[in-house]
Amino acid sequence: ATSAAQGAALDESVRKVLKP
């Protein structure tokens, strides 16, 4: 997996936490 892919996945998870 590439760093970009991991970053995108983390961003999506964080967005779910910030915007429930």
Curated annotation (Swiss-Prot):
Region spans: Disordered: 1-20
Miscellaneous comment in the UniProt entry for this protein: On the 2D-gel the determined pI of this unknown protein is: 6.5, its MW is: 30.8 kDa.
Protein name as catalogued: Unknown protein NF009 from 2D-PAGE
Lineage of origin: Eukaryota, Discoba, Heterolobosea, Tetramitia, Eutetramitia
